[in-house]
Amino acid sequence: MHNGFDALQLHANRLRGVTIPDLLAAELKRPEQYARQVGPLYFNFARQKYDCVALEALFALARNHNVTGAFQRMFCGEQVNVTEGRAVLHTALRGDLSGTSVAVAAYTAAAKVRERMYALIAGLDASEVTDIVSVGIGGSDLGPRLVVDALRPISQGRFRVHFVSNVDGAAMRRTLDMLDPSRTAGILISKTFGTQETLLNGRILYDWLGGSERLYAVTANPERAANAFDIVPTQVLPIWDWVGGRYSLWSAVGFPIALAIGSQRFEELLAGAAEFDAYALRVPLEENVAVLHGLTAVWNRNFLGCATYAVMAYDQRLALLPTYLQQLVMESLGKRVKCDGTPVDRDTVPVWWGGVGTDVQHSFFQALHQGTNIVPADFIGTIRNDDLYTENHFALNANLLAQIEVLANGQLSDNPHRVYPGGNPSTLILLDALTPQALGGLIAMYEHSVYVQSVIWGINAFDQFGVELGKHLAVQLLPALKGESVEVADPVTRAVLLRLRG
């Protein structure tokens, strides 16, 4: 059989007419057997549409593709980013697990950079600066923005951090209009310092601050940062080519995180991720949540034919998690060729999307309950929320449980307009509390789940060539928008350029 895929297709065919309530009735211990606790994180896969026999076939698929060996190669610093010839060592930013010379060197370098970062924070603490403007886009923005927003209520930092990513000048203006330049510092985050959005927004910030005295950079190209913005070397923090943007919040890209929540909280975030790394590397496939989560995604995509995947965060502090995961998953897995350049032989990543509960119940949940598509989902909540509004938290979690149950089980009615067909599989993820440790572990779990899927599909999760062509074309079209004579081949683009130029 084709590396286990044919056997799994037989199981999918066998289960086609089986409902999720049927599975729960057939496996009475399913709620416990399909649950896992990893530190402060609880996972329950009982409402996924597979049984124990199909699940064993999924684990066989993982063994056939040597997922365990793939984890070991990544953690040891082998060049698993084969298209760019690079190691992938974001895990070494938060811990040394493999003991190889490459990983140890990476961990040591990252620790030294954090020491420098904390020294810069101490210097800012002694100044009159109260606000930080962080300029970056994609992985230089989404991760830090998520963590700062999620952990703001337990922050130990004294700085208010404001994020600007969009090249639309309205975003920068809206931010600067509420700040005092004499009490503001800026951070420009770009691996290459060639990102158009960051350079344009950085120039606005440089001018508004009156120079580079309170301007910092996080980059793998310090010379370009110095040339473009006169940023002195002592205010530049390095990053490396073995850390991809969407995996970089653990590096100096996390500078705005540490400023916002404090150095100790940032270390707790790293520790939570490192704890999950150790778990992912050492726990057998059959018990490994990251492997199970990744295999479940493959099952829903390739054997149930689900073209989208939703993330529902039932905690307002995690409102940015669906957007963060959208980049992590779709930029990593949105590939049409394998590592060897041959076309993939099955569908890869579905469209990831989502929102925050209970708001989503009043927007797109109608389509989930009574539409024509089956949409697998992750529901993410917190067990304990140490705020003043405990009644609200009870109501939030009641809605969380109710929606999962109805989406899976449905409800019949004599009135066709009131039929809930059910059949939507979901995974429940609960954090004991939204702490830096729990958030770090949660993000690490998703990183490793993505890697598992990439190994099964035979694709490279660590490049993103698909984002390049549009950026290059935009640079070529910019002079034409300014009125310069530029040859434009596409007839529609030519016509629209004339309208944009007035």
Curated annotation (Swiss-Prot):
It is found in: Cytoplasm. Pfam families: PGI (PF00342). InterPro entries: G6P_Isomerase, G6P_Isomerase_C, Phosphoglucose_isomerase_CS, SIS_dom_sf, SIS_PGI_1, SIS_PGI_2. The active site is at E331, H362, K471. It comes from the Bacteria. GO terms for cellular component: cytosol. One of its GO terms (biological process) is gluconeogenesis. PANTHER family: GLUCOSE-6-PHOSPHATE ISOMERASE (PTHR11469:SF1). Keywords: Cytoplasm, Gluconeogenesis, Glycolysis, Isomerase. It comes from Xylella fastidiosa (strain Temecula1 / ATCC 700964). Catalyzes the reversible isomerization of glucose-6-phosphate to fructose-6-phosphate. The keyword Disulfide bond does not apply. It is an enzyme of class 5 (isomerase). The keyword Cytoplasm applies. This is Glucose-6-phosphate isomerase. Its EC number is 5.3.1.9. Pathway: Carbohydrate biosynthesis; gluconeogenesis; Carbohydrate degradation; glycolysis; D-glyceraldehyde 3-phosphate and glycerone phosphate from D-glucose: step 2/4. It catalyses: alpha-D-glucose 6-phosphate = beta-D-fructose 6-phosphate. The gene is pgi. One of its GO terms (molecular function) is carbohydrate derivative binding. Belongs to the GPI family.
